[in-house]
A protein has these predicted regions:
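Conserved "landmark" site that anchors the functional core of diverse proteins
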Residues: 1-145
Length: 145
């Protein structure tokens, strides 16, 4: 994988930086690498947390040390990994427009020189890529908005 860097992130985490720009291609690289890591069952790895352009890997330093984990990750990064997500799913998210849940709908429509129905149609007629999960349970960061 091109442009990857492995950085230290505290005393029990490594951060793999896959690039600098948020893109579906980098997201696909991260997703594929997460799948590869799960298949490898790396001893000592306690969690993998994908983000927009990076992957945080938490590990137990009593089980695997920094240097050994870094070497293993470098080897995995050299493998040609299929960038096709193996388990893509579509989630339908209910949306409320206008009223107390969307008091700015009319201002958005006016600013865009559209009707409120056109804003709703444009917003609800697309599929959006989930780049990562956020700080609240179920809070997704979407691309393509």
């Amino acid at each position: 994988m091109k442009e990857t860097k492995i950085l230290t992130a505290g005393d029990s985490s490594l951060l793999i930086q896959f690039g600098q720009e948020i893109s579906p291609e980098i997201n696909a690289q991260i997703t594929a690498f997460v799948h590869l890591m799960r298949e490898q069952h790396l001893e000592g790895v306690t969690d993998v947390i994908p983000a927009f352009t990076s992957l945080l890997i938490n590990y137990d330093p009593r089980v695997i040390d920094y240097r050994k984990l870094k070497r293993r990750l470098e080897k995995l990064l050299k493998l040609e990994v299929s960038k096709k997500a193996s388990s893509s799913r579509i989630f339908e998210i209910p949306v409320c427009y206008g009223g107390e849940y969307g008091p700015d709908l009319e201002n958005i429509a006016k600013h865009a020189n559209l009707t409120t129905q056109e804003v709703i149609t444009i917003h609800s007629s697309s599929d959006y890529l989930i780049y990562m999960l956020g700080f609240l349970p179920g809070f997704s960061y979407l691309g393509g908005l």
